[in-house]
C-alpha cells in the first residue's frame, strides 16, 4: 500500500491459528452420478405413485429431480429401463429398512421381522408402497411392458420368504409338510393385499391387522 514504511513486528505472541471448518470435500464423478440417479429415481417414484406409469415421461422425471429434461434418458435409456431401475430402487429401500430393524435369526423369526417391517413403514404418504402397487397393477396391461419386470421383482421377494421357510423347516419350527413355494405366495399375497386395501381405506387399523397377520403366519406355518 502507498505511504506504508517497513516496521518491526510487535513483540507479542501471534494468536494460534483457529482451525477452520474443513472445506467440503469435492465429490467424485461417481458420487455425483450416484446422487443424480437417486434423485431421478425418487422423482420417478413420486410421479408413479401420483399418476401411474402410463403417462410417465423421462423428461418430466428429469425436471422433477431438478435436472435437465434429457438426463433421465441419458441415464436409463428409455422408459422401460427407468421402470426396471425403479423396481430395483424399491427393493433397496426395503432392504435398508430391514437392515435398520433389529437383527433376526433365519426361519420363522425372520418371517415375523419382515411382516413387522412391512407394516411399520414411516412414509406418511406411503409413496414407495403406492408406486409399487401401481406398477404391479399396470403390469397387467400389455402396453406397459411391465409384466416381466414385476414378475422378476416378485420372484426376489418370494425367494426370500422361501429361504426362511426352508430354514424354519430345517430348524424344526416350521412344519415339514409346509410347501415353501406355496407358503411364500400366501405370505406375500397377504401383505400386498392388505396394503392395497389400506391405501384405498385409510381407516383400516394397520397395527391390528399386523398382529392378526403375525398370528396367522404362526398358526399356518408352525410345526404341529
Predicted regions and their residues:
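Helix-turn-helix
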Residues: 39, 43, 47-81, 85
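Hydrophobic/aromatic-rich alpha-helical bundle segments in the mid-to-C-terminal region
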Residues: 145-155, 169-217, 224
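Short amphipathic alpha-helical elements of helix-turn-helix/winged-helix folds
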Residues: 43-47, 121, 160, 190
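Amphipathic alpha-helical segments used for helix-helix packing
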Residues: 110, 123-148
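Residues at secondary-structure transition points
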Residues: 24-35, 77, 81, 85, ...
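N-terminal intrinsically disordered/low-complexity leader segments
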Residues: 1-35
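Generic hydrophobic, amphipathic alpha-helix propensity
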Residues: 33-44, 61, 86-90, 94, ...
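Hydrophobic alpha-helical connector segments
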Residues: 85, 99-130, 180-187, 207-210
Amino acid at each position: 500500500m502507498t505511504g506504508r514504511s517497513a516496521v518491526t513486528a510487535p513483540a507479542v505472541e501471534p494468536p494460534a491459528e483457529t482451525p477452520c471448518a474443513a472445506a467440503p470435500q469435492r465429490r467424485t464423478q461417481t458420487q455425483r452420478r450416484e446422487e443424480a440417479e437417486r434423485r431421478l429415481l425418487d422423482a420417478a417414484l413420486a410421479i408413479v405413485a401420483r399418476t401411474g406409469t402410463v403417462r410417465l415421461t423421462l423428461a418430466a422425471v428429469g425436471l422433477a429431480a431438478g435436472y435437465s429434461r434429457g438426463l433421465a434418458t441419458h441415464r436409463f435409456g428409455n422408459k422401460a429401463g427407468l421402470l426396471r431401475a425403479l423396481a430395483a430402487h424399491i427393493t433397496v429401500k426395503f432392504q435398508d429398512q430391514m437392515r435398520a430393524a433389529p437383527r433376526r435369526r433365519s426361519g420363522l423369526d425372520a418371517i415375523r421381522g419382515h411382516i413387522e417391517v412391512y407394516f411399520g413403514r414411516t412414509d406418511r404418504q406411503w409413496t414407495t408402497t403406492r408406486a409399487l402397487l401401481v406398477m404391479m397393477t399396470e403390469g397387467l396391461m400389455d402396453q406397459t411392458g411391465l409384466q416381466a419386470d414385476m414378475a422378476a421383482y416378485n420372484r426376489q421377494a418370494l425367494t426370500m420368504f422361501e429361504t426362511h421357510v426352508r430354514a424354519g423347516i430345517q430348524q424344526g419350527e416350521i412344519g415339514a409338510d409346509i410347501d415353501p413355494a406355496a407358503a411364500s405366495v400366501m405370505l406375500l399375497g397377504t401383505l400386498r393385499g392388505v396394503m392395497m386395501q389400506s391405501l384405498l381405506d385409510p381407516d383400516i387399523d394397520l397395527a391390528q391387522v399386523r398382529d392378526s397377520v403375525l398370528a396367522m403366519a404362526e398358526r399356518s406355518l408352525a410345526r404341529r
